[in-house]
């Protein structure tokens, strides 16, 4: 067994005393050295408890004869920065987390790594970082928070806030929702970006089977963290199995099929391609569209479904989803257990995993005085909620590279429609118009210059919630943007419109009262008329050419700092918006 940590000790005589000064004992220096990297911090509930899991990981490492060193790079919370310029830092923070993992791992020799995070940018940042570092690694998902009273979950706050702004509820009701929506640590309890990415980590084979989206307060999660520590040492000692030995294009295809089955966040179209890029694998929006077509949508969990995210684990989690779609999966892919996916699934059927999950489901039933079964949460393949996946990539003269819609969260009435354009150059202007009832039935509301190069690609969460929570507008208008949406967003919202406005994409050329065609079934997104009148496609092409000649590029929004760097080098949203150099 050749360990890089021991080779470096021979080359750098100061390494041992520096580690002893940090608290290592002399006998620790010759052990397998594992970097335990987490997003622990007081930044939000998804990271606030990770220090507890870190210590369990270190115990597991020690049990296998290794030593775990703690490294931290906390993440920010989209929910805490919503509605402010702080949200512009969100996507860029993913790159910085990956960069810090690279720096931590490569500046100091380690034989293996364990990575812990729960939420939107922490999970993909960790997965990008572990791919880049490529030492034997295990990822530990931080789990989900519990639901509150009346099964209240955080994604409902946007609805409550919009109702309050419209005078539909009083301040007392809004305050009740605020005080009860986050009753514990963990990721927000719906299938938003955080939950989706935890599930993707397991589906890729980088987390232990069954570990994604456990309740963060569960003792099961502590044991999984400890086992992840043990497994990291085993991988370093016995197989030196690296992430690049595990993750293949077939792994990503499995993950995307799971994404379809859970109706996962559209932000995965930013994160999975960026993770794949670090592995030297190319996936795009077209990959998602191909695999989602005819795929089964099975999960009845919020925001598209009825139940909070903790129910996902109680119903059997990722393994239960994979069992239902097994005939479409690559079962021979390798996983972090050192076994294939097919071997893992068979083992879980025989080791009491599903029986343990069901016991937790019965406890949940008692808590809320209901009688849920596994099949109420995860449908069978033959009784699927939907049979065309959960997202679609729309293309046309408005989005030549593509735009994404989560059609499972969109009213069927909007699947084929022609609307009147109402363009806005910032979310603030658009939200103000929606709340003041200046947007009408039949409008297509545009928010542009909010892509990666424009402003950092923030979420349009408040605007989408204001629209979807309005009984009239939620079924009669669309929101189209080169920005993105929260994983909690519902309604007729189309994001990632590419090329983005700042690059002169067609979304920058849209004018008031252009006619906008949306066709989810045929995957079309086109400008089909101007000033409220239909035109031929040849006429539209000519008009867009004239508008392009008159269009003037905007001055860069940022002149210094992280967002200047990100806006200069971010790739197209359809490629993953990672940094291109």
Task: Please give the residue ranges for each predicted region.
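Catalytic or ion-coupling anion/metal-binding cores of large enzyme and transporter domains
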Residues: 1-46, 55-73, 79, 85-90, ...
């Amino acid at each position: 067994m050749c360990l890089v940590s021991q080779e470096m000790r021979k080359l750098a005589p100061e390494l041992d005393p520096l580690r002893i000064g940090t608290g290592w004992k002399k006998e620790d220096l010759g052990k397998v050295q594992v970097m335990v990297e987490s997003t622990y911090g007081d930044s939000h509930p998804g990271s606030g408890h990770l220090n507890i899991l870190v210590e369990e990981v270190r115990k597991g490492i020690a049990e296998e004869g290794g030593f775990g060193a703690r490294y931290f790079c906390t993440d920010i919370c989209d929910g805490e920065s919503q509605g402010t310029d702080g949200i512009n830092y969100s996507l860029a923070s993913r790159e910085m987390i990956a960069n810090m993992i690279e720096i931590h791992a490569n500046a100091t020799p380690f034989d293996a790594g364990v990575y812990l995070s729960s939420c939107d940018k922490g999970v993909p940042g960790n997965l990008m970082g572990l791919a880049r570092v490529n030492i034997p690694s295990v990822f530990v998902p931080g789990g989900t928070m519990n639901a509150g009273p009346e099964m209240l979950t955080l994604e409902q706050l946007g609805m409550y806030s919009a109702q309050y702004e419209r005078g539909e509820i009083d301040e007392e009701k809004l305050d009740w929702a605020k005080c009860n929506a986050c009753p514990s640590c963990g990721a927000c309890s719906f299938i938003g970006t955080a939950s989706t990415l935890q599930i993707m980590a397991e589906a890729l084979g980088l987390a232990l089977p069954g570990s994604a989206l456990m309740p963060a307060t569960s003792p099961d999660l502590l044991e999984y963290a400890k086992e992840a520590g043990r497994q990291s040492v085993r991988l370093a000692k016995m197989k030196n199995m690296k992430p690049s030995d595990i993750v293949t294009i077939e792994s990503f295809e499995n993950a995307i099929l799971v994404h379809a089955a859970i109706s996962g966040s559209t932000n995965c179209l930013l994160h999975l391609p960026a993770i794949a890029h670090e592995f030297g694998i190319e996936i795009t929006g077209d990959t998602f569209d191909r695999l989602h077509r005819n795929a089964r949508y099975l999960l009845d969990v919020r925001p598209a479904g009825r139940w909070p995210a903790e129910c996902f684990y109680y119903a059997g989690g990722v393994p239960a989803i994979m069992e239902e779609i097994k005939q479409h999966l690559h079962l021979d892919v390798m996983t972090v257990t050192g076994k294939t996916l097919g071997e893992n699934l068979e083992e879980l059927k025989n080791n009491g995993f599903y029986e343990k999950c069901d016991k937790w489901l019965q406890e949940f039933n008692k808590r809320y005085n209901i009688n849920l079964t596994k099949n109420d949460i995860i449908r069978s393949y033959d009784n699927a909620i939907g049979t065309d996946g959960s997202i679609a990539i729309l293309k046309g003269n408005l989005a030549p590279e593509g735009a994404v819609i989560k059609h499972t969260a969109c009213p069927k009435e909007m699947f084929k429609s022609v609307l009147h354009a109402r363009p806005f150059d910032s979310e603030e202007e658009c939200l103000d118009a929606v709340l003041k009832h200046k947007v009408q039935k039949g409008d297509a509301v545009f928010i542009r210059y909010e892509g990666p190069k424009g402003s950092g690609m923030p979420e349009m969460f408040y605007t989408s919630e204001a629209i979807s929570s309005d009984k009239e507008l939620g079924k009669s208008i669309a929101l189209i943007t080169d920005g993105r949406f929260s994983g909690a967003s519902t309604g007729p919202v189309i994001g990632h419109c590419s090329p983005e406005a700042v690059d002169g994409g067609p979304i920058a050329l849209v004018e008031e009262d252009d006619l906008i065609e949306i066709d989810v079934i045929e995957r079309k997104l086109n400008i089909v008329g101007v000033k409220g009148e239909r035109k031929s496609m040849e006429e539209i092409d000519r008009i867009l050419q004239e508008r392009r000649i008159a269009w003037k590029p905007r001055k860069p929004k940022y002149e210094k700092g992280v967002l200047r760097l990100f806006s200069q080098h971010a790739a197209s949203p359809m490629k993953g918006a990672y940094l291109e150099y």
